[in-house]
Amino acid sequence: MKHTLTVLALCTLVAHASSGAVRGVPSDRVGGDLKGSHPGYMRVWVEKGARKVNVDSTGVILKGYDVVGYFTQDKAVKGSPKYQATYQGATYYFSSAADLATFKKDPSKYVPQYGGYCANGMKNSKLADSDPTVFSIVKGKLYVYEHSAAKKEFHTHSLEHVIKADHNWYQMFE
């Protein structure tokens, strides 16, 4: 397991080291019973294989924001229940039939990292809720954050923090 994580970290390092631009960035691990936990932590978990996704009580991820819109419009766009798809235990809303069709062609390209939990929280081994209007796209991957300060902190050492968050995610759910 340790060797696998080392290889994963090195692969992530190489992938991010050959990076391009970062879009969307301005020029205690929680488990078991969550009753009474910090209000920033989601209280609803949905199994998706061996992983968890951050959804509301109806199973909707990212509070209904359109994951394709982050990539095509470079902004958070509210989706509609009229256009929806379920993928790996979460329901995704889209702002248009075109975005829904795009998602269905390659869902893994658009899903948020760390199941939609705050990337900075995951860096610290915490499952913190996210605000879907606070996001970045790094190397073609969507990251969401609890608030703008978390996003800023995560991007102070982006490569290092992605590697650490990836490691923590695999420790929790793999």
Where are the predicted features?
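Sec-dependent N-terminal signal peptides
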Residues: 4-13
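Intrinsically disordered, low-complexity terminal tails and linkers in eukaryotic proteins, enriched
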Residues: 18-88, 108-174
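Mature extracytoplasmic domains of secretory-pathway proteins
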Residues: 93-95, 100-106
